[in-house]
Amino acid sequence: MAMSGGVDSAVAAARLFDEGREVVGVTLHLWDYAEGTPGSHGRCCAPEDQYDARRTADLLGFPHYTFDRRELFRKAVVDPFVDAYLAGETPSPCASCNRAVKLSVLFELASVLGARKVATGHYARVVRDEFGHAYLAQGRDRRKDQSYFLYAARGDEIERLVFPLGDSSKSEVRAEALSRRLPGANKGESQELCFVGATSAEYVSFVESRANGRLRPGPILDAGGHTVGTHSGVHRFTVGQRKGLGVALGRPAFVNRIDAASGAVHLGDADALARKRLRIEDASLREHVTLPRRARVRVRHGHDEAWASIEEDRGPNDAARRTLAVTFEEPVRAVSPGQVAVFYDEGRVLGGGRIGSAEPPS
């Protein structure tokens, strides 16, 4: 049982224990925070969270272990996060963490500990199609659904995953934690950027502290290509951004495109944010999914899905990785390269990948 020290994993563990499962709690130490660090609550590996995970295991009566995976987390999540922002992209570190760290490490530890299943506190489900094939699926509470971040789970992993909270709402889980008097029952929501902080100033400072001379200043251009300002680095911007641009045009303006090579940040009006076709890199699909096909596609966590066609798009330099082309039936707005696109069919996750580029309607 993966235990972060938060309310969700605590309730998930308690439910499994009530079912008579033989539970072993596992906490991954991924990042360092000094005791009492301001704002560390709700981030990964805050000292009090690791302590609460152990307290929950002790209260319920099952063993708990903490494993140090800080170096892996830095290489697989933190360094690519910084690199992406410096390249003018907007990364999705939670998807990267689940793919490259949490799932791989948890299944590795399950083998060591002799566990047949791996459980987490994610709001997601496992369902089967008419042929008995297992699929990751959206949680019943669509506002908390976390299937987006787990899109890259392999078929053999999905067969062994257990999501005790998949049919619950957050309010139900919170009430249960309080009634059980579980440690951390009153904790607030965890942050998506768990190792950085919630504000743009925090992530900008984080990236700059690790840039090592790679900051890319450049011009800010209006829709006509005229220079209307300058900036100190493309890492300060994301496609669709309106506030904090550092320029005043007398009309609403949004970041339309970021050219990391030249350092130019291109502005436009709201209509200029429309995108029709995406190139998806490092894509993964469930084994039984065939292309081309029509599916609903989500381009950012918390956004609604939109209908699109998906097909192979292998170029001459793509021999080592799978690339796909996604063409929306109606344009979608504010698509950021570096984010993840996830494909759904009636709530089932078909696959997904990193958005490499996004083209406007012709």
Please name every model-derived segment:
Residues 1-151, 162, 170-173, 178, ...:
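ATP-dependent adenylation/nucleotidyltransferase module used to activate substrates
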Residues 7, 119-362:
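AMP-forming adenylation/ATP pyrophosphatase catalytic core
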